[in-house]
């Protein structure tokens, strides 16, 4: 059975579910709803949705279904049990597809229970509600918790051995060449040393003291980033398979969310310099400018994270302007706060997943290490975590200065200006 693309909106009285099923056999259409679940079948399509709030049972007389032949869509109205109740996170596709362990099927039929493989399952209950919408992920080989705790990387710093195993094939898609030998807690300092060694004073001064018109246009460009969940995102979300993440997560939700900030920074930088669209170098930009993707670093605060992002943006990309980095930080703040929060982040993660697949150079491995797990995580992380990070971002945005970078940028600029003044003076004709 195929999981169709779907959209859900709501008014005070009902959920309005659009289901795209252009090849469905309308004669075999069947749907049901009640309690916390909605089920739709129209071969070859099957859809089962799980809500956090209750809907009325089918047959109440308040629902409806309409076939839109021009669009190949079913429009189904599902009445709410409690009128004017707000249903949250209706764009969190994966979360809607994931069964709840506490709620029930329509009309009180209990959800399928997990059974031991040795038990006889010949006598099934015949319920189409139990059709699996996603195949189980392949189990990973067990890793030493001690090694993961000390040297882990990827989402939640919970993976180990991937880079070492694939190093000959993937080359240098990350700057930390042997993460299995660099402790998690030491990576932030190692990152700063690495970036300082690669910092080009001449390139920085050129973009700072004599910025090109194109750079000035990039800095002044009005925010135009797309933040809505797209049809392409919805297709990815319904088909994306959840891998088994190690039980040894080496970070709490705040630390994991802080890591996501620098991933969003790389994406926002790339969007701004490419006129709000992806380009051939987008995969490189997004991966290179994110300390989490390029160095598997962990940060103790939002400010420390943004300083690391700023250093990398002054060291590696085409434009190396402090003013530009602060503009990008404003973009990040807008995305995570005023720009849509959870849905906006979900869209960005889906787009990054696409970018890393299409950009080549084995960057798809970053999806396996981090992005796919973040796509699932952002749909379920508690609201209070998002609120805390939003508050921290709002407080720090606009308050990072060059002194905080730790590279004596102001001294460097002053010396360059003085040298230019002396050169101009030497060029003046004697009276």
Swiss-Prot record:
Pfam families the UniProt entry points to: SHQ1, SHQ1-like_CS
One function term, GO molecular function aspect: unfolded protein binding
Annotated Gene Ontology cellular component terms: cytoplasm; nucleoplasm
InterPro entries: HSP20-like_chaperone, Shq1, SHQ1-like_CS, Shq1_C
GO terms under biological process: box H/ACA snoRNP assembly; protein-RNA complex assembly
Protein family (similarity comment): Belongs to the SHQ1 family.
Role noted for this protein: Required for the quantitative accumulation of H/ACA ribonucleoproteins (RNPs).
UniProt protein name: Protein SHQ1 homolog
Species of provenance: Caenorhabditis elegans
């Amino acid at each position: 059975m195929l999981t169709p693309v779907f959209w859900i909106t709501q008014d005070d009285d009902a959920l309005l579910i659009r289901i795209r099923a252009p090849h469905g056999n309308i004669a075999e259409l069947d749907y049901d709803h009640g309690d916390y679940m909605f089920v739709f079948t129209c071969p070859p399509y099957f859809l089962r949705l799980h809500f956090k709030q209750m809907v009325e049972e089918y047959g109440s007389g308040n629902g409806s279904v309409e076939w839109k032949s021009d669009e190949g869509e079913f429009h189904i109205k599902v009445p709410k049990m409690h009128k004017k109740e707000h249903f949250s996170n209706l764009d969190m596709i994966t979360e809607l597809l994931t069964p709840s362990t506490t709620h029930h099927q329509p009309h009180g039929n209990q959800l399928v229970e997990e059974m031991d493989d040795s038990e006889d399952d010949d006598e099934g209950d015949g319920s189409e509600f139990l059709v699996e919408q996603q195949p189980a992920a392949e189990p990973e080989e067990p890793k030493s918790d001690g090694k993961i705790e000390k040297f882990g990387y990827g989402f939640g710093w919970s993976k180990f051995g991937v880079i070492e195993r694939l190093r000959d094939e993937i080359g240098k898609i990350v700057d930390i060449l042997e993460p299995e030998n660099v402790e998690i807690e030491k990576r932030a300092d190692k990152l700063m040393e690495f970036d300082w060694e690669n910092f080009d004073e001449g390139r920085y001064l050129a973009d700072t003291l004599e910025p090109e018109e194109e750079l000035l246009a990039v800095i002044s460009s009005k925010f135009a980033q797309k933040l809505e969940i797209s049809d392409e995102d919805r297709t990815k979300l319904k088909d994306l398979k959840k891998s088994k993440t190690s039980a040894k997560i080496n970070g709490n939700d705040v630390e994991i969310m802080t890591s996501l900030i620098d991933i969003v920074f790389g994406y926002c930088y790339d969007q701004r310099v490419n006129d709000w669209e992806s380009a051939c170098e987008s995969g490189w930009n997004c991966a290179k400018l994110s300390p989490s993707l390029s160095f598997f670093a962990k940060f103790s605060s939002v400010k420390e994270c943004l300083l690391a992002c700023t250093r990398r943006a002054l060291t590696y990309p085409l434009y190396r302007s402090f003013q530009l980095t602060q503009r990008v930080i404003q973009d990040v703040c807008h995305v995570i706060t005023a720009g849509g929060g959870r849905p906006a982040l979900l869209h960005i993660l889906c787009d990054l997943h696409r970018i890393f697949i299409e950009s080549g150079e084995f960057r798809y491995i970053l999806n396996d290490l981090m992005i796919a797990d973040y796509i699932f995580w952002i749909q379920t992380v508690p609201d209070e975590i998002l609120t805390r990070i939003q508050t921290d971002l709002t407080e720090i945005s606009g308050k990072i200065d060059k002194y905080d970078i730790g590279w004596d940028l102001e001294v460097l600029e002053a010396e360059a200006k003085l040298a230019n003044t002396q050169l101009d003076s030497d060029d003046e004709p004697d009276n």
